[in-house]
Amino acid sequence: MLRLAVATNAETYERMQAPLADRGIETDAIETAERSIHVAAAAGGDSSQNGAGQFGEAFDVGFVFPPRLAEGGVADALLDVPWVNDRECILRSRGKGETLAWLSRAGLPTPETVVVSNPVDESVLKDVFAGFEPPVVVKPNSTTRGVGVALAEDLDSFLGICDYLDLVHDYRATGDQSFLVQEFLPDARDFRVMLIDGKVVGAVERRLPEAALAAGQWKHNVHRGAEATGVDLDEELGEEARAVTEAAAEVLDIPWLGVDLLVTDDRVVVNETNARPTIDEATKYESGFWDDLASLIRAQV
């Protein structure tokens, strides 16, 4: 039986264990963060406490490079296995600005976006804001789950948000000192499309409850209270959405990918991508999803 190292013990790991076991793949969660890892030890030591032995029995393949890149690099070196979505895939998707730059270069539709690399003069920020019709979305380049994303209705609010980002970026250990300024699409519907090897295998629409909308919420992240409902992508949006998402996966060359679409009456745009997407309930995927995922895992060996 193939041994799969899974760098998470959350929903994805819980949901994949039984379906993959039925397909000859044994999964085991590995902890790569918030622990100590011996990277070098004296000869003749306990092998279970050194090298790859610290992660349990030997593995054949890993499922998605670990979320913390530094510790993930240590685990990668010690485990010496191929990954479904390696380090380069994670980096290509994690940097929102880079993702949108590659997609835009390929002619795919994306929101109007400016990447700001701190520090910059206030005059630069004023020029950036002047290029948009307010309000504008301000988001850190590398965060997930809607963390740090804000809406600026006017110039003073925009500059105030940028001031807070300056405080964060002033800390010398901050690796990514960039952020995005984007157009706001207030009435857009929000979809997450899942792809395996460039093929759509499922989609959900993320909606906020009426109470949340009434309270002024606008972010559609599930971790922020949105509800995800499985949809048939072609029935909901037609062939254009499928074509756009599959083209995005091809451009980014990421085999296991979530693509976030914003859809208005006249536009379908790729807003973000996620190379570490959570596996949802099986009912939200097309038939054959688990077979496709098992095939992708085996293809890495």
Pin down the residues of each PLM region.
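Conserved N-proximal alpha/beta basic substrate-recognition cap immediately N-terminal to
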Residues: 7-117
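Phosphate-binding site of ATP-dependent enzymes
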Residues: 153-244, 248
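Hydrophobic residue at the +6 position relative to the catalytic HRD Asp in the kinase catalytic loop
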Residues: 259-261
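Active-site nucleotide/adenylate-binding loops and adjacent lid/helix of ATP-dependent enzymes
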Residues: 80, 92-180, 184
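C-terminal active-site "lid" helix and adjoining low-complexity regulatory extension at the edge
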Residues: 236, 250, 254, 263-301
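Protein kinase-like catalytic core scaffold
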Residues: 136, 202, 257, 269-272
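Extreme N-terminal starter segment of soluble prokaryotic enzymes
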Residues: 1-5
